[in-house]
Structures are given as structure tokens and as C-alpha cells.
């Protein structure tokens, strides 16, 4: 039997966004299971009401009053789909905390997410932005995204191609942002650890010795903590920006003018380090 949804009016969201803003939702509910989504869909269509999905509440600046329904995705659970000598496939509920998920995968000997440690938010929000950090993007590790389609009223899996992942972009963010509710994400992770250390700051932090996944995770957490305060102590929206991508020709011109320019080769040209650019402008912090 599907658990009924509980709707609350004039619900304060201050504890549910990382800025701690005292926003008030016109209506609020929590989704504990994908089985509740047809009822949610019906409720919204009956009232012709806008929907705001809420995960961990980062990358979000809320108005004082949020019209319509705010639905917080709280779907939990881990399901081991496949295990071989080389890899595992795990399906994880959209409401699981992202950082806790990364820590747990490393503890269980499943590798590939450690460079994405300490990114705020939930598992279900991660594909929307195609989160990435220190040489790894989510799309490198995803094999399916489980969704509820508000257009058809059906639940289905989308493969990575269907998700239209781009640089900090996806189907869910810019192409059809109001069509799907992500209910779970399936990852393909390695059983043997191979470190991804292209990011110079990470290499410097770890040195030249052989490293473990836990050491990479710890180093990433240390670097991120130096750059950004803990939202539990100082409210912030998290770290989100795009490194500008320029042509090889423009990169060569810029490198001539600014020999210390930090950039990385990219399939479409060169990716300039936004952090370095911000620092050079005197705007760090």
C-alpha cells in the first residue's frame, strides 16, 4: 500500500536550504517513495500548480515566498544490481546525501566517485548539473537515471545518451527542466582503484607516493574546505561556476599575454581555470 502524501501549508524552508533563508513555501510535501509520484502528479494537475523540487537545498537562492508546491525528494536506499571482478553497478535513491554516498562507496571498495567528495546536495540532484570536480564528471560514472515522467505519468530509466550530459548541463537542467523527477541513479564503479590526479592541486596535496582512494577523498575534502566555509556555520549556496572554454587560437593569444594562465586541454579547445581568473581579478573569497 502506497503511503499517502502529507501536504503542509505555509511551510518554513530555512532548515532546508544551505543559505538558511527564511523562505516560506505555499505548500510543502516530502516524497519517500517513487510510488507516491502518481498521486503527487494528480494533485498538481488538479490545481494547475507550479512544482519546485528540493534536494539538499544548495545552488539555490529562495524568494521570501515560494508559490505552488515544494516537494523534497527523500527517497533512500541502495541496491546492488551487478557485481563482477572488475566493477559493480549500484542503484542509489535520489534522496541520499551526495557526500555520504561517496564516503560509503569508498568504504565498501567501490571506486570512481572519490574526486567528487564534499559536493553539497543529494544523489538525485547530481545528474541535473552533471556535477564535476578535480578531473571527474558524474557522466563518467552513471549508467542509468531512473525518472518519473510528468508528461506521460510513467517511470522509466534514461541511459547516459538520453540524459544529454554536457559541461555542467543535462536534459534535466536546460532541455526539459520541468518534465522529469529523478528517483534514483545507477552508477558503474570499479573494484580496482585507479587514481585520477590530473588536477595539479590534488597531485601537490598527495605527493608522488602511491595513494589510496581514502587518501584522495581526504585530500579533496581538505582542498574544498579551504576554499569554501561549511554551510552549517556560514550560509552559502555551495561552489558552482563554469570554467570558460576557449578555442586553441584564443588560448595561445591569452597565454602569450598571461604566461601564468592556468588551463586544461578540452575536446572543444581549452578550459580556463575560473578559480585562477577570479583570483587574478582580486575577487577571491
Which residues fall in each region the model found?
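Phosphate/pyrophosphate- and phosphate-bearing ligand-binding catalytic cores of soluble enzymes
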Residues: 8-9, 15-18, 60, 155-285
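Anion-binding (especially nucleotide phosphate/pyrophosphate-binding) glycine-rich loop
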Residues: 2-145, 149-151
Amino acid at each position: 500500500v502506497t503511503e499517502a502524501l502529507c501536504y503542509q501549508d505555509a511551510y518554513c524552508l530555512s532548515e532546508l536550504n544551505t543559505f538558511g533563508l527564511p523562505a516560506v513555501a505555499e505548500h510543502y510535501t516530502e516524497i519517500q517513495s517513487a510510488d507516491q509520484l502518481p498521486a503527487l502528479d494528480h494533485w498538481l494537475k488538479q490545481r494547475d500548480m507550479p512544482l519546485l523540487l528540493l534536494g539538499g537545498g544548495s545552488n539555490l537562492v529562495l524568494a521570501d515566498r515560494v508559490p505552488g508546491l515544494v516537494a523534497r525528494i527523500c527517497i533512500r536506499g541502495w541496491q546492488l544490481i551487478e557485481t563482477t571482478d572488475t566493477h559493480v553497478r549500484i542503484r542509489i535513491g535520489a534522496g541520499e546525501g551526495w557526500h555520504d554516498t561517496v564516503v560509503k562507496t569508498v568504504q565498501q571498495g567501490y571506486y570512481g566517485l572519490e574526486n567528487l567528495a564534499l559536493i553539497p546536495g543529494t544523489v538525485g540532484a547530481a545528474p541535473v548539473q552533471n556535477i564535476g570536480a578535480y578531473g571527474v564528471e558524474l557522466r563518467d560514472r552513471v549508467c542509468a537515471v531512473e525518472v518519473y515522467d510528468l508528461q506521460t505519468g510513467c517511470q522509466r530509466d534514461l541511459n547516459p545518451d538520453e540524459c544529454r550530459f554536457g559541461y555542467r548541463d543535462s536534459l534535466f537542467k536546460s532541455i526539459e527542466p520541468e518534465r522529469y523527477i529523478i528517483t534514483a541513479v545507477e552508477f558503474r564503479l570499479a573494484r580496482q582503484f585507479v587514481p585520477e590526479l590530473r588536477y595539479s592541486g590534488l597531485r601537490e596535496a598527495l605527493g608522488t607516493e602511491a595513494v589510496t582512494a581514502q587518501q584522495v577523498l581526504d585530500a579533496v575534502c581538505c582542498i574544498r574546505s579551504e576554499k569554501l566555509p561549511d554551510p552549517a556555520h556560514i550560509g552559502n549556496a555551495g561552489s558552482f561556476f563554469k570554467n570558460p572554454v576557449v578555442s586553441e587560437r584564443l588560448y595561445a593569444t591569452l597565454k602569450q599575454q598571461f604566461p601564468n594562465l592556468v588551463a586544461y586541454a578540452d575536446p572543444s579547445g581549452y578550459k580556463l581555470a575560473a578559480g585562477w581568473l577570479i583570483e587574478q581579478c582580486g575577487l577571491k573569497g
